[in-house]
Amino acid sequence: ENNMNTYTYIHEFGHVLGSDDYYDTANKNSPLSGCDIMDYMIGDHNAYTKFNYGWLSTSRLVVAEESVTLTLEDFSKNGDSIIIANNWDDALGAYQEYYILTYYRNTGLNGGEFGYFQNDGVVMYHINASLYKEEQDGEVYYDVYNNNTDGSDQYGTLDNLIEFVETSEGNIVYTAGTS
């Protein structure tokens, strides 16, 4: 019996589009707690992944020193998200350090038993997609530090590419409700 489902195809096609697995194959770290299609093959692609693919046309950038009041629409409907950054560089796009806020709904690919959370709410991600430069045999390569799938931490950074933001009590920043 073949246990493949739509989520498996979405996950594997994510690799075709350039995404790494977000789970730690050494099982030492769970930065997304299994709550992503590229992590535990549940739900949809998260805001960082869609931003990296160029699929987020409705993202709004907020410079960290600003004080603003914003409204978030359902991320699963239109990709609405808020990017919060200190020193944003347009030339780097997704490949820098920042936060992303989304309004999560338990619908669509996130619906039912395959959803991240049972209730609707705001989710905050910390992204560290900073690039590093490597030279080998006269060729220059750029890559993203990613400890999510590297148990040996070959880059020596101990940084996760993407992770839920945690409170001082160790809980993820997730607020159920609409306000």
Language-model segments: which ranges?
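Extracellular hydrolytic enzyme modules, especially secreted metalloproteases
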Residues: 1-115, 130
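Non-catalytic C-terminal accessory/binding modules of secreted extracellular proteins
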Residues: 68-179
